[in-house]
Amino acid sequence: MEYQNNIFDDIRPYYDSEISSAMSRIAESPYFPKLASFVFPGSSVDEIREMILAIDNIYDFQFKVMHQANLRIIEESVTDFTYSGLDRIDPEKQYLYVSNHRDIMLDASLLQSVLVNHNYKTTEITFGANLMKGQLVIDVGKSNKMFKVERPGGSIKEFYKASKHLSDYIRMTLRDKKESIWIAQRNGRTKDGIDRTDQGIINMFRMSYDGDKVQSISELNIVPIAVSYEWEPCDLLKVLELYVSNHHTGTYVKKEGEDLNSILTGIIQPKGKVHFAICKPICIDELMPFSELPSNEFNRKVAGLIDQRICSEYVLTPNNYIAYDMLKGNEQYSSEYTPEEKLAFSRHLSSLNAYSETCDVEELKEILLGIYANPIESKNHFTQN
């Protein structure tokens, strides 16, 4: 559906009427042959180019191209792809899927495959403005129902304006366009394995609604998503980033091309078992006890509801238990893994020895163990309280 009101043209995905032009640009990109060969290894580049040029709507692009790309990623890098909770959502309703965030692209992209496999509509997807660079990325992203989200920066006034604009777009999309949305629970990926919802995200959701704060959240139909990877995407890159942050004051500054490197690494790196848990929607009855709370406390409580869902339904793997035992120096969870699995994880841990000339390897290893062990701490916290 296309809207005459153009106030969201700066962030919205493409309309169907813009797809043909986008496909022409994609087909002529110098990166096209390599992408086509990966997604469609059994076809020639010319055949795929002809197919791309015939696409003139979002649905066909998502089903014929992006769904096939997801299937290839699963085939090449995932040993077991599972999901749960589809019975908790109604295909006729729109939801705001709030997900933990472990991989720049795959957290949202692989969820679309789950939905497509069961004839659910795909979602619109938030995509950081820092990533929406280069014509190919813009065309693929906006043809795939991605919309741009500005990262924090600039003046407080500018950030407020951008947050209000995003909030208005999210509510309009759910209410008027009748489209679901995927958004991460926080700004940027979780680097330390601790999945927590940013209270600022909850505040942003509310900015587009002037009335009752309970109603402002309940009508969004929030559905938490817990995605877990046996092998954490870009885990070594995350370790190095955390290490640098620990040893330098101020905020970590990414190098040119670092986000693209993380995207590509996340796609091709072996991921082992991957599970998506679609959690129970947040309902108004759960929100009502918070109705009289001050605004900041209300936001904290709503974020806590989302965290409880995500951490409780996060599926743990042997790597989590191995890392926890190694970090604690005991064998509390030894029944959850085999000697072979522990050996494989230990070999992966040893790969950090390559950085011995520039870093404290023992600290690097402790950071990596924390990334894998922290989901156990989180699950224990929320299931015992």
Predicted stretch roles:
Residues E230-K238, L242-G257, N261-S346:
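Long, C-terminal catalytic modules of enzymes
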Residues D16-S17, I58, P152, Q199-D212, ...:
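General structural signal for secondary-structure boundaries
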Residues D56, D60, G153, K157-Y160, ...:
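Charge-dense, low-complexity intrinsically disordered segments
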Residues M1-Y95, H101-Q112, V116, I138, ...:
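Membrane-anchoring hydrophobic helices of lipid-metabolizing enzymes
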Residues E2, E18, E28, E47, ...:
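Glutamate identity and glutamate-enriched acidic tracts
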Residues M66-N70, E75-I282, A354-Y355:
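Soluble catalytic domains of membrane acyltransferases
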